Amino acid sequence: MAFELPKLPYAFDALEPHIDKETMEIHHDKHHNTYVTKLNAVVEGTDLEAKSIEEIVANLDSVPSDIQTAVRNNGGGHLNHSLFWELLTPNSEEKGEVVEKIKEQWGSLDEFKKEFADKAAARFGSGWAWLVVNNGQLEIVTTPNQDNPLTEGKTPILGLDVWEHAYYLKYQNKRPDYISAFWNVVNWEKVDELYNAAK
């Protein structure tokens, strides 16, 4: 069965002024859609068609070598963005078990946000910043390009796209401003749900 572009769970302009409508439209309808189209083209006729995107990305080593890079890039792009849309909301509320766990590990939510923001800003070139569950503990990691922590056996529960296409129309070269705005639209309810499923 072909992979599909998921519908956004909110309107394109719902995250204004933090993430602008035009960026959301291009990011979802063009960038994410291209990953889906290319992924479907590369897995067509292989046994990967029957697998979930999570299963494929978690087991990249078992993907045939001639298509592994294309699957890594486009499969990762599809998985990362599918998760990213769900992790955003116009109604951000900092609550849940995961927030308490963050405070326990980092001392405060602000300390966590600072470390996450620093790592996201320091990610050279294109990539992602993640909060993952690793052996029952929370950890902040970054990945290059469209790599996903699942490939390393870590479960992502919060992710931030730091590719320029995610912010350049509004923030230009000011990635730290985009990262700062991100906290206003984090769907902590979804983060908490993913945390409880992964711990």
UniProtKB/Swiss-Prot annotation:
Record's keyword terms, sorted: Iron, Manganese, Metal-binding, Oxidoreductase, Stress response
Gene3D superfamilies with a match to the protein in the record: Fe,Mn superoxide dismutase (SOD) domain, Iron/manganese superoxide dismutase, C-terminal domain
Enzyme Commission number(s) from the entry: 1.15.1.1
One GO cellular component term: cytoplasm
Function field: Destroys superoxide anion radicals which are normally produced within the cells and which are toxic to biological systems. Catalyzes the dismutation of superoxide anion radicals into O2 and H2O2 by successive reduction and oxidation of the transition metal ion at the active site.
Quaternary structure, from the entry: Homodimer.
Name of this protein: Superoxide dismutase [Mn/Fe]
Species this protein is from: Staphylococcus epidermidis
Gene name, Swiss-Prot/TrEMBL: sodA
